[in-house]
From Swiss-Prot:
Record's miscellaneous remark: Negative results: has no effect on Kv1.1/KCNA1, Kv1.4/KCNA4, Kv1.5/KCNA5, shaker IR or Kv11.1/KCNH2 channels.
Protein name, UniProt field: Potassium channel toxin alpha-KTx 20.1
Compartments (UniProt record): Secreted
Chief place of localization: secreted
Organism placement in taxonomy: Eukaryota, Metazoa, Ecdysozoa, Arthropoda, Chelicerata
Biological role: Reduces potassium currents through Kv1.2/KCNA2 and Kv1.3/KCNA3 voltage-gated potassium channels.
Native species: Tityus trivittatus
Amino acid sequence: GCTPEYCSMWCKVKVSQNYCVKNCKCPGR
């Protein structure tokens, strides 16, 4: 699974290929 904390980390680095970025609500994306 993908925890909010883990998603938040990927949102910060903006790795668009990562499934967390695709499946989580990232601010500004």
